[in-house]
């Protein structure tokens, strides 16, 4: 019962009864649920919309999103700016994939990673959109090179050595060495990301801090082929959860460079709390993959245990001091329900049924991860994004 022990560090709650799951109501819940019944279906029909109607279609899509965001209490003006940038990121990353001949599956990874990173908006708004985009790109490429280098073959080994030399060789520590390394290095997606960081306009002090945090993250996650400080899979369930949370926390530390926020010592508790929630949602999302690969997380147990742990995670989201009474709480809840609906066979049927019946802002029959996945194919998504930007 590792999760039960960890959550009791924060809450005095008993998470064994899934009847405690009371999904948040928000203003306009009925309208949002109505929209959710049509939203994905509308997107799937985008490819049949004549070009002369693209501008009108873009207005409809944007308006649907604004209604949802406005009703959950999020600044619609900022969301418009944010989604405009997200659309440009996705289109830019598609070109990045083509330029470096990367696997198409990375587009979907980028899509989910970019949205997952938005959890940090609880602390402040994104102020450097180019940096945020570069951080997501760099993380995806490095994660795949170190974790699944087979996708790249010999090129992957060269890129992996480039990252190793850059950080372990100390090129990141001062500007002269850094620029010299970039000049001598060949191409490749990682070097392009490093070059983007150099061009973004950060002060040298901020660049040094950013590179240092990347170094700490990569070292923690991958030293010793994943079995080093951050890859401890032999220390039992608690150690796995602890190390996963620390890895997530180190990742969030990097995203702080892209948002309007000055880190304070007293926020350390909040940051760890958010890291725990983000990591647990990630484990929840990866149940099927983790089981196939023989990994152990708190969601790779039996159906009853998974259900209890899902209820505890829900309680953690609803009672977290950092998320409670925040506009983003309903979005966290919705993400969790989408994931549980997708992985229904790993939970008690009564629990899944309760979520499907009672969620006030989503009709999970129509708006679910299977349908969303069917839309997040690069060509369809590319057209949707172009229409949205019109």
Give, region by region, the residue ranges found by the protein language model.
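Extended intrinsically disordered, low-complexity coil regions enriched in Ser, Thr, Gly, Ala
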Residues: 152, 156-161, 285-291
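An N-terminal, globular interaction/scaffold subdomain
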Residues: 41-105
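Intrinsically disordered, low-structural-confidence terminal and linker regions
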Residues: 1-38
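C-terminal structured domain segments
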Residues: 307-368
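All-alpha helical catalytic cores of prenyl diphosphate-utilizing isoprenoid enzymes
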Residues: 82-140, 144-148, 181-291, 330-334, ...
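Acidic, carboxylate-rich catalytic segments that either coordinate divalent cations
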Residues: 3-7, 344-390
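Divalent-cation-assisted or electrostatically stabilized phosphate/pyrophosphate-binding catalytic cores
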Residues: 160-198, 233-247, 291-322
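Charge-biased, low-complexity intrinsically disordered regions
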Residues: 15, 40-42, 54-62, 295, ...
């Amino acid at each position: 019962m590792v999760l039960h022990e960890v959550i009791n560090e924060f809450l005095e709650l008993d998470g064994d009864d899934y009847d405690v799951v009371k999904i948040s109501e928000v203003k306009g819940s009925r309208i949002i649920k109505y929209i959710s019944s049509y939203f994905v279906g509308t997107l799937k029909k985008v490819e049949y919309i004549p070009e002369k109607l693209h501008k009108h279609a873009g207005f409809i899509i944007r308006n649907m999103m604004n209604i949802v965001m406005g009703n959950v209490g999020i600044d619609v003006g900022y969301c418009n700016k944010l989604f405009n940038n997200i659309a440009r990121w996705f289109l830019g990353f598609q070109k990045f994939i083509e330029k470096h001949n990367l696997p198409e599956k990375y587009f979907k990874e980028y899509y989910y990673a970019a949205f997952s990173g938005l959890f940090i908006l609880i602390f402040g708004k994104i102020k450097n959109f180019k940096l945020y985009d570069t951080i997501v790109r760099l993380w995806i490429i490095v994660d795949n090179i170190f974790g699944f280098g087979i996708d790249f073959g010999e090129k992957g080994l060269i890129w992996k050595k480039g990252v190793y030399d850059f950080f372990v060789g100390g090129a990141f520590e001062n500007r002269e060495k850094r620029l010299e390394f970039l000049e001598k290095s060949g191409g490749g997606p990682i070097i392009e990301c490093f070059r983007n960081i150099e061009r973004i306009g950060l002060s040298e002090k901020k660049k040094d801090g950013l590179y240092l945090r990347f170094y700490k993250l990569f070292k923690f996650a991958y030293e010793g082929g994943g079995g080093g400080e951050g890859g401890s899979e032999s220390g039992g369930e608690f150690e796995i959860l602890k190390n996963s949370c620390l890895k997530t926390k180190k990742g969030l530390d990097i995203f702080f460079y892209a948002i309007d926020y000055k880190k304070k010592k007293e926020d350390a508790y909040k940051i760890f709390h958010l890291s725990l929630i983000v990591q647990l949602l990630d484990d929840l999302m990866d149940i099927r993959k983790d089981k196939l690969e023989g990994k152990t997380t708190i969601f790779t147990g039996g159906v009853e245990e998974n259900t209890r742990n899902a209820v505890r995670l829900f309680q953690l989201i609803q009672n977290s001091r950092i998320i409670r009474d925040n506009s983003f709480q309903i979005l966290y809840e919705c993400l969790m329900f989408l994931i549980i609906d997708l992985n229904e066979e790993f939970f008690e049927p009564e629990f899944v049924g309760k979520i499907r019946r009672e969620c006030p802002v989503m009709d999970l029959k129509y708006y679910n991860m299977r349908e969303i996945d069917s839309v997040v194919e690069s060509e369809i998504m590319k057209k949707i994004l172009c229409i949205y930007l019109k």
